[in-house]
Structure formats: structure tokens, C-alpha cells
Regions:
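A short glycine-centered flexible hinge/capping loop motif at secondary-structure junctions
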Residues: 174-178, 399-403, 440
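Bacterial N-terminal signal peptides
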Residues: 7-15
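Sec/SRP-type N-terminal targeting helices
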Residues: 41-45, 58, 90, 104-132, ...
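Short flexible linkers and secondary-structure junctions
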Residues: 21-142, 287, 291, 334-335, ...
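Acidic, low-complexity, intrinsically disordered peripheral segments
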Residues: 210, 215-222, 422-449
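Small/polar, glycine/serine/threonine/aspartate-rich low-complexity segments that form flexible
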Residues: 68-102, 230-242, 277, 290-328, ...
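Periplasmic alpha-helical coiled-coil/stalk elements that build and connect Gram-negative outer-membrane
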Residues: 134-256, 370, 374, 416
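Bacterial Sec-pathway N-terminal export signals of envelope proteins
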Residues: 20-66, 70, 76, 220, ...
Length: 449
């Protein structure tokens, strides 16, 4: 009796807490998860960095400009350049230089680096979308689990109440002499079993809700109530767009557009190809052109020597220069190894791209097969639930008339309960697979507020 009272009180307060707060729809849960997911934030930061890298690659086409100032203080014996004799003097030299240089040819390294940065900037958005899609699919799966377990509580509670009502009837029939004491005990055992199933189902529901909070990055201490159903399963089973898309996938074995995962894999393969070209350019000659201006100031600090003024020397010593440099790499083992490593990375990236496309194809086709399978299961289970419900009703009438044993009645009740749970599970999976099929065909999960 204490257990019964505990279940009633717990169910009463749980229902009050759920009714007292706003239910979260699937769209709201996905939006919250995408906003607070660390994976999405990380990809957003990476996107900003790719934009900065692209701007830097543009600046690499401009000449490099440098300025240099140096000072030299020397003393002791040295050779006088005028008399070619040794003397002992102390001097101070001050040098100034301003120069610029531009690369005329580097094997396409700068150009390919620019193309690589431009590609990375474009693919960064696909990486963000991939993170958002992955999070949406994860939350959708956890949301369906949470809805399923919550709905299962209602079925388990209904079964428990029916068993209690049956116990009351059996006790009255026992008092009238129409049922034996073992029948009453067997029904009491059935009630205890249903109490356990109800408690177990509540535990599974709490666990599923906690998994949903974890996937959403939702505060564990805050309450979260999910809506009754993510979609109308009857509408999902007859969506013309999904049915057409499914037939197209089944006939031709392909989907209409590449999803972000494949787009990102293709961008990585192209990035690796550009990197190979950049490393290969290091093995080619490099031609650069430069020029600038330079001047200096000199002063002999030995006693009795008078130097010209700083301004006069700065102007008189001013000179210009221009140069051209051709650098030819003859042997550099590390450069050859980096080029070889880059080519290997490119070949591996091509394999990853092929694998990503294959995986997308397999996942899409599997979603279509599951979608058709669960749609047929829902139709069949609806008929089975109707039949099992009628069979249980007739068995209850026979039991009241003394024509059926408690065990047989319990068997029909368990069969009806299992059919209802299977129907609920198939409905939830149909709703999930309908959205996945829509995602593989249109790129949208079809989530609406």
C-alpha cells in the first residue's frame, strides 16, 4: 500500500510540474542546442580565423618594406685607409637604410596560398553548417527518445490502473464465492509487476530527459518538458515530397545535393592539393627584385678631430641601390620530404572524400529503407493494437463470467501492452526517419516551431 501511495503522489506532483511549465518543441530544443553547442562555437571561431587568413594572403602580393637603423662604436688599433698605417682611434658609425622587395617568381607559392586561403574561407561556412546539422540530428534522436519514454509512462500507468481495477473486481468475486484465493493473489502479483514497470519506465524517462539535456548543453538543474510529439506521424507517413524523394533514391541510388559533410571533405581534399603545390614550389628557383636608399653618419672621437654635422653627412652620404636575386635550390632533403608528405596527404584526402560520399549515400539509402519500413510497421501495428484491444476486452468479459483464468487474462493484457509500446516506438522512429530523409534530399530537417 505504501508503494501505491508513493506512485500516486509522485505521479501527481510530476504532472503538476509538467503542466506548470512551457513545453519545449523539437525546433526550440534544436535552436537552443545549436546556440550553446561548443562544437558550433568552435567552428564559428575557426570561420573568423579563416577570414583573417584570407586577408593576409591578399597582402602577400604586395612588396615587403623594411627600415633598418644601426650604430657601431669601435676603439683600438686599426688601419687608416688614407695612409695605410696603423693608428689608435675611437670612432662612431651610424647607418640608416630603407628598402623594399617584391617576388617576381616563386613557383606559384603565393598564388596557391591565396587560392588555399580563399577556399578555406568558403568552406568554413560549410564546416559551421555541418556542426549545426550534426548537433540537430543528435538532439532530434534524444528528443524522440524522451518523447517515447514519456508516452510510455502513460501506457504503463494505464496498465497499472487497469490491473488495480481488476484486483477490485476479483476481490468482490472472491467474496461472492466466484473466484478463489489463488486468483486474488495472482492479480495482486500482476498489480505489483505493473507497479515495478511504471517505476522502471519513469527511471528510463528521467534518463532520456537527462541525455537530451546533455546533448543540448542545457543546465542539469533546470526543468525541461518536451512536447507530446515532434511531428504528426500520420502526416509524416504521407508526405508527397518525402515519398517522391524516397522513390528517387530507391530507383537511382543517389541524392539531390551534397550535404555539408561531403562539402567539407571536398574542401579538405582541394586544400591538400594546394598545399602540395605550395611545397613543390619550394623546389623551384625564386626570383625577386628589390631596391632602396641608404646613408650613414661617421665621427672620429679621437681628440682634435672635428666631424661634419649630422645633417650634412646624412644628405651627402645618401645613396640608392637596386638589386635582383635569383635563388636556385640544389639540394634540400627537408624540402623534398615536405613535398612528398604533402602529396601523400592530398591522396589520403581524396580517399576521405570518396569515403564521405559513400557514407552519405549509404546513410541516405538506409534512412529511406527505414522510412518505408517503419511506415509499413505503423500501419500493421495499428491493426494489431485494434485486434489486441478487442481481444483483451472480450477476455475481460469472459473472466468476469468465469470462463477464463487470471493467467490467460494477464497474457492478453501483456500482449496489448507490448503492441501499444511497439506502435509508439514505430511512430517515433517514423517521425525521426521522415526528417532524415528530408534532410538528405533537401538539406533541411523540416523542423518547424
Amino acid at each position: 500500500m505504501k508503494t501505491k501511495h508513493y506512485i500516486l503522489i509522485m505521479g501527481f506532483f510530476v504532472s503538476l510540474s509538467v503542466q506548470g511549465q512551457e513545453s519545449w518543441t523539437l525546433a526550440r530544443c534544436i535552436a537552443y542546442a545549436q546556440e550553446h553547442a561548443s562544437e558550433v562555437r568552435r567552428q564559428t571561431l575557426e570561420q573568423e580565423q579563416k577570414r583573417a587568413d584570407y586577408r593576409t594572403s591578399l597582402l602577400n602580393f604586395l612588396p615587403s618594406v623594411s627600415a633598418e637603423v644601426s650604430g657601431q662604436y669601435s676603439w683600438g688599433r686599426n688601419i687608416d685607409p688614407e695612409t695605410n698605417t696603423y693608428n689608435n682611434v675611437t670612432t662612431f658609425n651610424n647607418y640608416y637604410q630603407l628598402g623594399a622587395s617584391v617576388t617576381l617568381f616563386d613557383g606559384g607559392a603565393i598564388w596557391n596560398a591565396f587560392r588555399q586561403a580563399r577556399l578555406d574561407r568558403a568552406s568554413a561556412q560549410s564546416a559551421v553548417q555541418q556542426a549545426r546539422d550534426d548537433k540537430a540530428i543528435t538532439v532530434m534522436e534524444k528528443y524522440v527518445d524522451a518523447v517515447y519514454t514519456r508516452r510510455s509512462i502513460a501506457l504503463a500507468e494505464e496498465k497499472w490502473r487497469d490491473s488495480k481495477a481488476l484486483l477490485v473486481k476479483t476481490q468482490r468475486l472472491f467474496e461472492l464465492g466466484e473466484k478463489s484465493r489463488p486468483d486474488v493473489v495472482q492479480v495482486e502479483s500482476q498489480v505489483a509487476e505493473d507497479e515495478y514497470n511504471l517505476l522502471h519506465q519513469r527511471h528510463l524517462a528521467d534518463k532520456a530527459l537527462n541525455d537530451l539535456k546533455t546533448a543540448m548543453n542545457f543546465p542539469a538543474g533546470d526543468s525541461l518538458a518536451v512536447s507530446a510529439l515532434p511531428v504528426d506521424v500520420h502526416t509524416a507517413a504521407t508526405l508527397p515530397a518525402n515519398r517522391t524523394a524516397c522513390d528517387s533514391l530507391m530507383r537511382h541510388g543517389f541524392f539531390l545535393a551534397e550535404r555539408p559533410a561531403v562539402t567539407v571533405a571536398a574542401a579538405k581534399a582541394e586544400h591538400a592539393r594546394m598545399e602540395w603545390k605550395i611545397q613543390r614550389a619550394a623546389l623551384l628557383p625564386k626570383l625577386s627584385l628589390g631596391g632602396g636608399e641608404a646613408t650613414n653618419y661617421y665621427k672620429n672621437l679621437t681628440a682634435g678631430y672635428k666631424a661634419e654635422g649630422f645633417g650634412s653627412q646624412f644628405r651627402n652620404n645618401m645613396g640608392e641601390y637596386v638589386y635582383m636575386t635569383l635563388s636556385i635550390p640544389i639540394f634540400n632533403a627537408s624540402s623534398w620530404n615536405r613535398a612528398r608528405r604533402a602529396k601523400t596527404d592530398w591522396q589520403e584526402a581524396q580517399l576521405d572524400l570518396a569515403e564521405a560520399r559513400r557514407k552519405q549515400h549509404d546513410d541516405a539509402l538506409q534512412a529511406v529503407l527505414d522510412y518505408h519500413g517503419y511506415a509499413r510497421e505503423v500501419e500493421q501495428l495499428q491493426r494489431k493494437v485494434a485486434s489486441d484491444s478487442l481481444a483483451h476486452h472480450l477476455s475481460s468479459r469472459k473472466y468476469e463470467e468465469g470462463m477464463l483464468s487470471v493467467y490467460d487474462l494477464h497474457t492478453t493484457a501483456q500482449t496489448l501492452m507490448q503492441s501499444r509500446l511497439l506502435l509508439l516506438q514505430s511512430e517515433m522512429m517514423l517521425a525521426l526517419k521522415a526528417r532524415l530523409v528530408n534532410y538528405y534530399v533537401t538539406g533541411e530537417l523540416g523542423v518547424r516551431n
